[in-house]
Amino acid sequence: MSRLIIAFIVVTMVCSAIALPKKKVEPLEKDEKRSLAVAGAVIEGGNLVMSVLDRILEAIGDVNRKIAIGVENQSGKSWTAMNTYFRSGTSDVVLPHSVPSGKALLYDGQKTRGPVATGVVGVFAYAMSDGNTLAVMFSIPYDYNLYSNWWNVKTYSGMKRADQSMYEDLYYHASPFKGDNGWHSRNLGYGLKCRGFMNSSGAAKLEIHVSRA
């Protein structure tokens, strides 16, 4: 009988030791997922929330003109990065290369370092698997006495790289949205639609969701 009791105690201790690590792993896995939500990363589309963009802005540091961008792909198409064109400002990260449907890309931008009176303004382009281009424009000015935050999304027929011409089209001609702390939406054509939000401050957040129309 005593042998059975000892065996039972040993088995119980072994099982307890095996079970203990599980309690420690779960928080670590959550921390790992959170750490992936940085500019230049691709995350699950459902994880694109404002708090993610807040962390990107915090990581940029003490820069008075900066932007955190998140674009969710629910288009049913895969996206492949082509390029970013900066009219002013820059980014220290690479535009995420491949964004499958169901995922979201994270990106950022900031004014040029140093005592220069510039904002962060630009456009980036993605080739979609249907042969067309998705373009996203953002404009965070230096002087809010003269300018405001603006953003835009547009699909172009065929493959079109981001450049000055694309920026001018999206900023001046293609009905851009003002960064007014509100949500806006539109039909993009090619079976797609979008909704997005941009705030009005110099630490800008741009959240966009592209989906089937």
UniProtKB/Swiss-Prot annotation:
Assigned protein family: Belongs to the actinoporin family. Sea anemone subfamily.
InterPro entries per record: Actinoporin_PFT, Anemon_actinoporin-like, Cytolysin/lectin
Annotated positions for site Important in the initial contact with the lipid membrane: 147
Segments of this protein annotated with the region N-terminal region: 45-64
UniProt-recorded Gene Ontology molecular function terms: channel activity; toxin activity
Keywords: Cleavage on pair of basic residues, Cytolysis, Ion transport, Membrane, Nematocyst, Secreted, Signal, Target cell membrane, Target membrane, Toxin, Transmembrane, Transport
UniProt free text on domains: Composed of a long N-terminal alpha-helix and a core region rich in beta-sheet structures. Before the pore formation, the alpha-helix binds the lipid membrane, partitions into the lipid-water interface and stabilizes the monomeric molecule on the membrane. Finally, it traverses the bilayer, thus forming the transmembrane pore.
Function as written in the Swiss-Prot or TrEMBL entry: Pore-forming protein that forms cation-selective hydrophilic pores of around 1 nm and causes cytolysis. Pore formation is a multi-step process that involves specific recognition of membrane sphingomyelin (but neither cholesterol nor phosphatidylcholine) using aromatic rich region and adjacent phosphocholine (POC) binding site, firm binding to the membrane (mainly driven by hydrophobic interactions) accompanied by the transfer of the N-terminal region to the lipid-water interface and finally pore formation after oligomerization of monomers.
Any one GO cellular component localisation term in the record: pore complex
Species of the source: Anthopleura asiatica
Domain of life: Eukaryota
Spans annotated as Trp-rich region, which is important for the binding to lipid membrane: 139-154
Region feature (Plays an important role in the hemolytic activity): 37-46
Cellular compartment(s): Secreted; Nematocyst; Target cell membrane
Pfam entry (one): Anemone_cytotox
Residue ranges of the propeptide: 20-34
Binding-site list for phosphocholine: 88, 121, 139, 141, 167, 171-172
Extent of motif Cell attachment site, crucial for protein stability: 178-180
Protein's GO biological process: cytolysis in another organism; monoatomic cation transport; pore complex assembly
Residues annotated as signal peptide: 1-19
Quaternary structure, from the entry: Octamer or nonamer in membranes. Monomer in the soluble state.
Protein name, per record: DELTA-actitoxin-Aas1a
UniProt keyword Nucleotide-binding present: no
